[in-house]
């Protein structure tokens, strides 16, 4: 078990009009990125978007599953978990996200 980290599930829409974090529903973060899913461009855009949205360095966002899928899992510092859920107050508690 990795102390200090947690796993967040993400659903990605590629080739969108803008890069945007859309919602957090049932522990799954929905994001849109402008990049196409070619040669890792969309994955890089997702990492950059999450880092900017959460105000953390890109190297603190690690893609651990779903490299070629719309559904991805990223490893994030546990310290930002509460911040993420504060951005979407209508969602369930921070414990809805998966722990690592």
From Swiss-Prot:
Disulfide pairings: none
A Pfam family it matches: DUF167
Organism domain of life: Bacteria
Cellular component GO terms held in the UniProt record: cytoplasm
SMART domains, per database record: DUF167
Alphabetical list of InterPro entries matching this protein: DUF167 (IPR003746), YggU-like_sf (IPR036591)
Family: Belongs to the UPF0235 family.
Protein's name according to its UniProt entry: UPF0235 protein TC_0667
Organism the protein comes from: Chlamydia muridarum (strain MoPn / Nigg)
Lineage: Bacteria, Pseudomonadati, Chlamydiota, Chlamydiia, Chlamydiales
